[in-house]
Swiss-Prot record:
Gene3D superfamilies: 3.30.190.20, 3.40.50.790
Record GO terms (molecular function): rRNA binding; structural constituent of ribosome; tRNA binding
Gene Ontology CC: one annotated term: cytosolic large ribosomal subunit
Source organism of this protein record: Nitrosococcus oceani (strain ATCC 19707 / BCRC 17464 / JCM 30415 / NCIMB 11848 / C-107)
PANTHER family: 54S RIBOSOMAL PROTEIN L1, MITOCHONDRIAL (PTHR36427), LARGE RIBOSOMAL SUBUNIT PROTEIN UL1M (PTHR36427:SF3)
Self-association state and partner proteins as the record states: Part of the 50S ribosomal subunit.
Protein name: Large ribosomal subunit protein uL1
GO biological process terms, semicolon-separated: regulation of translation; translation
Database matches in Pfam families: Ribosomal_L1
Function as written in the Swiss-Prot or TrEMBL entry: Binds directly to 23S rRNA. The L1 stalk is quite mobile in the ribosome, and is involved in E site tRNA release.
Similarity comment text for this entry: Belongs to the universal ribosomal protein uL1 family.
Length: 231
C-alpha cells in the first residue's frame, strides 16, 4: 500500500489543480503514469445535465467502441431453436434456456454480458434478483433483449459498452486499456460522446455534457477540456 501511495502522490504532482486538460494530453498523462503490475483500463465519467430522479431523464444506452476494450468478453445467451444456433455461430460462450437458468441459480455466473431473445424473458425474468444487482439483467433499451441475438453477440464480442446514469446523473464506463495508442482511445471516446449526444432527453435543459473525467483503474481523475473532444 505504501508503494501505491507514493505512486498516487507522484501522479498528483504532475496534475495542476483545477486545470482542464486537452483530451490528448490527458490520455498521454494516463499512459505515462500507468505503471502498476497489471494492465489498467482507461475509464471515463461523464456528468450529464439531467435529473435522474425523473424517469424521462434517465440516460441508458450502449456503444460499440471501434477499437474494442482490449479484453475477452464472455457472453451468455438465453434463447432456443434457430436463435440458439445463430448465437453459437456468432461466438456466444454459453447458450441455453431453462438449463442456463439453473446454472445461474446455482451461482455459476461466469459472464460479462447476458443476452436474451424476447421469448426467453419468461425464464430470464425470474432471475432478476440474481442478475439485476450484478448489472447483467437483459434490457431492450441497451440491445440485450432482441430478436437478433447473433447481432447482439457480435457487438458484445467486439467491445460494446453499456451505461446508465447513476443517482448523481453520471455515466461510467471503460474506453480501452492503457496499452492502446492515444488515437485508438480518442476514437473510442468519440464514439461514446457521439452516442451520448444522441441520447439527450428532450426534457433536459441547459448544458448536457457538463463534465468529462478520464482515469485509470488505480489512478486519479483528469478533467478534460470539452473543447478538445474529438467530435
Amino acid at each position: 500500500m505504501a508503494k501505491l501511495g507514493k505512486r498516487l502522490v507522484g501522479i498528483r504532482e504532475k496534475l495542476e489543480p483545477g486545470k482542464l486538460y486537452p483530451v490528448e494530453e490527458a490520455l498521454n498523462l494516463l499512459k505515462e503514469v500507468a505503471k502498476v503490475k497489471f494492465e489498467e483500463s482507461v475509464d471515463v465519467a461523464v456528468n450529464l445535465g439531467v435529473d435522474p430522479r425523473k424517469s424521462d431523464q434517465v440516460v441508458r444506452g450502449s456503444t460499440v467502441l471501434p477499437n474494442g476494450l482490449g479484453k475477452t468478453v464472455r457472453v451468455g445467451v438465453f434463447t432456443q431453436g434457430v436463435n440458439a444456433e445463430a448465437a453459437k455461430n456468432a461466438g456466444a460462450d454459453v447458450v441455453g434456456l431453462e438449463d442456463l437458468a439453473e446454472t445461474v441459480k446455482s451461482g455459476q455466473i461466469d459472464f460479462d454480458v447476458i443476452i436474451a431473445s424476447p421469448d426467453a424473458m419468461r425464464v430470464v425474468g425470474q432471475l432478476g434478483p440474481i442478475l439485476g444487482p450484478r448489472g447483467l439483467m437483459p434490457n431492450p433499451k441497451v440491445g440485450t433483449v432482441t430478436t437478433d441475438v447473433a447481432g447482439a453477440v457480435t457487438k458484445a464480442k467486439a467491445g460494446q459498452v453499456r451505461y446508465r446514469t447513476d443517482k448523481a446523473g453520471i455515466i461510467h464506463c471503460s474506453i480501452g486499456k492503457t496499452s492502446f495508442e492515444v488515437d485508438a482511445l480518442k476514437q473510442n471516446l468519440r464514439a461514446l460522446v457521439e452516442d451520448l449526444g444522441k441520447l439527450k432527453p428532450a426534457s433536459a435543459k441547459g448544458i448536457y455534457l457538463k463534465k468529462l473525467t478520464l482515469s485509470t483503474t488505480m489512478g486519479p481523475g483528469i478533467a478534460v477540456d470539452q473543447a478538445s473532444l474529438p467530435v
